[in-house]
């Protein structure tokens, strides 16, 4: 495993009045000039050990990672009452992070992916649509997407959560069997099966058994009250760490991004 250097940086969002977003950049010290990179988007509660766990395995596979603190830049404390009102308004953060990485000398601008968790997973899915991507990039898009438990019940049911007409890039969608935002392990399968064939073939779905929301967040063992829980009925949602499933998700992430950001380039 190569050593990794840590850098604390500031990312400028692409809002009309840009936000200055604190972020942690990790760069593998493996002697290579340019690396693929993955942006890791936190959930409603803000930055956590979860993102660092994924960064560890991606760095070990030779990828740069960038973890932002999107809430502090807005003076928000996190949670259902302390997050932005809409996910759409945070897309300027994500594309600002992409611009930051594309300009970084250690990064190959053509090989940038994104993984997001919960709220961040929703942003990841939005960025995969041609509609939202075109609002920031006239040419190009992220090379790979990995949304993790992004409340799949919301898609194509509420305004601004339209999912379809996807950019030409692979997606690994990870959900939890016991996630109480969806309240049905078939929800994610129904979403994917309802897409056009062109979009369906871009998506690999993994439903993690015995897994609640936040199954990959070390130390999570709590109940939260969220109006988006229980398919929009609101109420209590269990968040519980499952170390075995977390380890499996890390392995899936490393394999997915390596295949699509590292190995794919080697084959071309």
Where in this protein do the model-derived segments appear?
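N-terminal cap/lid segment of alpha/beta-hydrolase-fold proteins
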Residues: 1-33
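Short substrate-entry loop that stabilizes the transition state in hydrolases
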Residues: 31-35, 40-77, 154-155, 180-185
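Cap/lid segment of the alpha/beta-hydrolase catalytic domain
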Residues: 45, 49-52, 57, 70-89, ...
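Alpha/beta-hydrolase-fold catalytic nucleophile elbow
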Residues: 69, 115, 145-149, 174, ...
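Primarily recognizes the serine-hydrolase "nucleophile elbow" in alpha/beta-hydrolase
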Residues: 89-166
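Short alpha-helix in the alpha/beta-hydrolase fold that links the catalytic acid
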Residues: 159-160, 183-194
